[in-house]
Amino acid sequence: MSGVTESGVVESDVVGGRSLGRGFGWLWGAYTVSTFGTRLAFDAFPLIAVMVLDAGPARVAALSAAGLAVGAVVAVPLGPWVEFRRKRPVMIATDLLRCAVLLSVPLAYALGRLGFAQLLVVSVVVAAADITFRAAAGSCLKALVRGPDLLRANGRFEATTWTAAMLGPPVGGAAIGLFGPVVTVAADAVSYLLSALGIRAIGGGEPHPRRAASRLRAGDLLDGWRYVLASPALRPLFLNTVLVNGLIMATAPLLAVLMLGDLGFAPWQYALAFAVPCLGGLVGSRMAGPLVARFGEHRVLVTSGVLRVCWPVGLAFVGPGTGGLILVMAVEFGLIASVGVYNPVYATRRLELTPADRVARTLSAWTVSGKLTTAALTALWGLLAGLTGTRTAVALAGVLLLATPLLLPRQPHTSAPSPSRPAADG
């Protein structure tokens, strides 16, 4: 039977690790439905900008980059604010906010009033709400799932992510072809509403976090970064993950140009090349737990962290035809399988190393840094491709990735941190 402890933690339905508890089940369900909604609407805004508003490449690029970067900046003060609020109401509020602003797009389209500025504002609001939700969700997960089961929980989230990445875009593309360009945005909005209902159903008490100061001070905005950069265990993990993700994502637009333009692949071939390898994420996420049980967390973290950066340089050698398509799929499968192992292990270690009263600030700072780094590197690699050529820019990113294992943690952590004292929170 499920039970609720005095601290508001929902205990496991089944003893012995077979169940992660009713509360986690609802959290996982909420994550699943919103993730599938988001992947259904993958690249929906650029498509709407092109198909409905006749936007050119510069405006489409600005829409993607500005939404990411401005949303991240807007979210900076929200991490410290979320830390000292009950997390589930924050998650529900951000879900409902995303639902409302996304529904404004099909509504404006139906009324003939949709404009580029509205798409830009909606993308900024959704990006900021997404960062805020993730910060609160990390704290919620740590409260719902006991330490030894965190890896299993993160493995389930990772498997869900790659399943949605594999199935969502093709289904979304078919829906756009049948029903028009805004249908997937409406579906994404509904997914956030369902997510809010799932979080509401978690049940159990949630105590109000306590802090010494009654008001948020300007210095509190940097608390997350101060904690991460001062931690000898978290700092290398932070620098490695942010840089690797940024370099991988920076080449995504360049690969589209290379494959769809220079090499003449059809759009369906391009979609297939990146959809099928997502099976690697399912394989990797299922292997993470058994690998850690056999070889230990630190060894699996470092090995998968190294393996994930060995693949992207191969994308610089893609050629036309079936051989080129197979090369891309093989490289992406290896990359995604390695990431599928690495991500749940790294996410688990990050939560284990972060005191409960600092999780929201830490995750917010982490996500903001990741999004800003990705936006900056994407813009930089676009300029680099214009100067050196697309293939050369892809190769350079791959070579730089080979140096990133130097930033991986050298030593395993030995114990979980104790909660920091309220006075330290300012």
Predicted features and spans:
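Alpha-helical transmembrane-bundle signature of multi-pass membrane transport and export proteins
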Residues: 1-426
